[in-house]
């Protein structure tokens, strides 16, 4: 998540520069054909650019709205996880008759948060864009906590060796930890450390956590529909390719209104203006593409590592622990 005021124009230009190079070539070719080789027949009617540009605007706007909704939903689910975690800390402290049980339950919950965020960020999907050259280049300017330490090292802070060994052979470690929580609550109830009402409430809270886990896993595992993403790319690049052909004749007509060295050369203005207009569409498409997957480790991700750190500090304060970790610090105004 970007925590600065805004991205700078220099960052945007550097991030999109490879596409700018392509747009530049696409704009120069029709101008050279028109001006140097005299192929004036290649000029297309301006109405073609208007119609295609309008259609492209609608589909790009639709895509960006939908990808923003995915990020917003991810943020809302993690906000719910944080709120339910605070409640979990309170009932673990107050419901069991022996306070020692609270520490075990809370630390296992912190392990669940850790396993969940590693599952979301630790494994990529083929449709994710963080592996693109532009995103990989920008990735060097900020930190992804899940790439700096392994899950096993993080889990050692919260779990005994026996539980770590049990987790080692499981595929979905977050779900396994929820299963272990349910078993622990059942044992507390069997030992009469929980009354029926408290046992029921704790099981209900575990169900809430499982529901929230399923929601973020759905966002992770179900991409923005590929048919919409594909047609969006076709529209954007078709518009970028045709725009210079529609502009050359319009700029050539400006020769009648100028004098001196500009006479006969106004058509070359097609290149910068075509690149500028096309770049706006291509950049909007790239922004939407980079926002599709809020758990891939991109600069616009939901800051799940920071949310987990907030929850960890608060829950360990509930246990009156004093050796607390610090909040994560942003790097290059990005925090994840």
PLM regions: where:
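N-terminal juxtamembrane/topogenic regions of multi-pass membrane proteins
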Residues: 1-85, 94-98, 256, 262, ...
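Membrane-interface, cytosolic juxtamembrane amphipathic helix immediately N-terminal to a transmembrane helix
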Residues: 2-15, 194-197, 209-234, 296, ...
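Short, surface-exposed loop/turn segments at secondary-structure junctions
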Residues: 42, 71, 95-103, 195-199, ...
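A structural signal for well-ordered alpha-helices, especially hydrophobic packing surfaces
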Residues: 89-92, 113-120, 124, 185, ...
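Long amphipathic alpha-helical segments that form oligomerization/scaffold cores
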Residues: 93-193
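Cytosol/matrix-facing amphipathic helices and coiled-coil assembly/linker segments
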Residues: 109, 176-188, 197-220
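Bilayer-spanning, highly hydrophobic alpha-helical transmembrane segments
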Residues: 231-250, 275, 279
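A hydrophobic, small-residue-rich beta->alpha segment in the mid-to-C-terminal subdomain
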Residues: 274-278, 289-302
């Amino acid at each position: 998540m970007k925590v600065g005021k805004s991205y700078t124009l220099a960052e945007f230009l550097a991030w999109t520069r490879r596409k700018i190079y392509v747009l530049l070539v696409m704009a120069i070719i029709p101008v050279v054909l028109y001006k140097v080789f005299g192929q004036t027949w290649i000029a297309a009617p301006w109405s073609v650019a208007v119609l295609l540009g309008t259609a492209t605007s609608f589909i790009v706007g639709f895509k960006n709205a939908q990808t923003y909704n995915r990020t917003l939903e991810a943020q809302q689910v993690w906000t719910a996880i944080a709120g339910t975690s605070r409640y979990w800390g309170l009932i673990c402290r107050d419901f069991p008759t022996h306070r020692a049980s609270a520490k075990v339950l809370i630390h296992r919950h912190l392990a669940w948060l850790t396993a969940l965020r590693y599952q979301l960020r630790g494994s990529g999907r083929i449709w994710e864009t963080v592996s693109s050259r532009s995103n990989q280049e920008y990735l060097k300017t900020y930190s992804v906590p899940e790439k700096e330490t392994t899950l096993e090292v993080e889990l050692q802070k919260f779990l005994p060796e026996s539980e770590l060994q049990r987790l080692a052979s499981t595929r979905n470690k977050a779900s396994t930890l929820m299963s272990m929580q349910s078993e622990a609550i059942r044992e507390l109830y069997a030992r009469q450390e929980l009354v029926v009402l408290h046992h029921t409430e704790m099981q209900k809270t575990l169900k809430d956590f499982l529901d929230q886990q399923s929601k973020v896993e759905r966002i992770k595992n179900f991409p923005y529909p590929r048919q919409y993403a594909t047609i969006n790319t076709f529209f954007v690049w078709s518009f970028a390719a045709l725009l210079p052909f529609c502009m050359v004749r319009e700029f050539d007509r400006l020769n009648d209104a100028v004098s001196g060295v500009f006479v006969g050369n106004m058509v070359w203005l097609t290149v910068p203006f075509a690149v500028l207009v096309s770049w706006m569409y291509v950049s909007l498409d790239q922004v939407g593409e980079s926002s599709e997957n809020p758990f891939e480790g991109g600069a616009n991700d939901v800051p799940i590592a920071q949310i987990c750190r907030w929850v960890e500090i608060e829950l360990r304060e509930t246990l009156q622990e004093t050796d607390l970790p610090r909040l994560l610090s942003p790097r290059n105004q990005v925090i994840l």
